[in-house]
Amino acid sequence: MACVKSVPCCEAERGEDMKKTWYLIIGVVLLVIGGIAYGYHEHHKPKTAQELKTVRVAYLLITHALPVFATEELETPDGPVHVELVKYGSWPELMDALNTGKVDAAAVLVELGVKAREQGIDVRAAALGHTEGNIIIVNNDINSVQDLKGKSFAIPHKQSTQKILVDLMFERAGLSEKDVQIVEMSPPEMPSALAVGQIAGYSVAEPFGSLALEMGKGKVFEDPDHLWHDNICCALVFNGKFVDEHHDLAKAFTKAYLDAGKYLDEHPEAQKEISLKYMKFKDSVIERSLKVIGFGDLALTEDRYNALVHHMTHIDLIKNVPSYSEFVDQSLLP
């Protein structure tokens, strides 16, 4: 009889358990639906006015990126563009972000942009980052190019103006990479590597040349302008998809960028002020670095482009040269 009486109790307990299970299932389903709805809302909600005019720009912490910094500094709340700067620690990392659309534009080695275009990646240049501004530094005991034979010499990247300048310097002296070991090295590491004798010299963007001079661990070895007159190095390069989808914004940013370059050229004091705000170096290092760089003429002309790809071809950095119109998007110019 005890078993018979327990049946209703067991059934009641099972019923309560089933209710709890269903409540739990319903709760989970509602949470999932709520999460999906929230995600959909966040993805599709209207962008704010600032978001609609935001351009994400990648950069490395070098003097060559000064026009990008100045563009942000000169930005006004009611202006057509909002700049969102994204700092990277190396050129490969930065180029990956540009190529994949993680950023909209970048201040980047122009050779990397041309090489990406050769590889079928849709990137488009609008302007230069500066003129001149490169430096070749060697140990204090190096007195001729021949003294570099058998030693290591650093550059920031194989696809760079620094690589071109170094190859031209060696070529004039009758040397090649068989005689001097060329190593790629992050610019911030170069001054200390020179100081401890890891390398005998390097070619780099400022202020990392001036930093070695400030430390008393190196000296200027060669004037890059004597190797390649009017040499170009960095450029403002856009992700092609961003340009297609936001052409007016890309054009507005290009104008703001060129205006910033003109402002820097006309206000030398602003060059130092903005540089010190973004780059934590001594005043003397920044002052020295700014003496060898210009921002007044940022036009990536066809003549400049032809000189660039001539040198790139000459030292085997590129095989299939993109045409000027393929790489430089003149529709972005004011």
Where do the model's predicted regions map?
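Secondary-structure end/capping motifs
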Residues: D244-K319
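Pocket-lining segment of extracytoplasmic ligand-binding domains
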Residues: V110-L112, V183, P188-S275
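N-terminal Sec-pathway targeting helices
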Residues: D17-L30
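Short, glycine-/small- and polar/acidic-enriched structural segments
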Residues: E42-L175, Q181-E184, A200-E206, K219-F221, ...
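Short, solvent-exposed loop/beta-turn-alpha elements that line the ligand-binding surface or hinge
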Residues: E75-V81, H226-W228, F295-E302
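Ligand-binding clefts/hinges and TM-proximal coupling segments of bilobed small-molecule sensing domains
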Residues: G34-Y40, H82, S160-Q181, K255-V285, ...
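Short, Lys/Arg-enriched N-terminal segments with co-localized hydrophobic residues
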Residues: M1-D17
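Conserved C-terminal helix/tail region of periplasmic/extracytoplasmic solute-binding proteins
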Residues: T313-P334
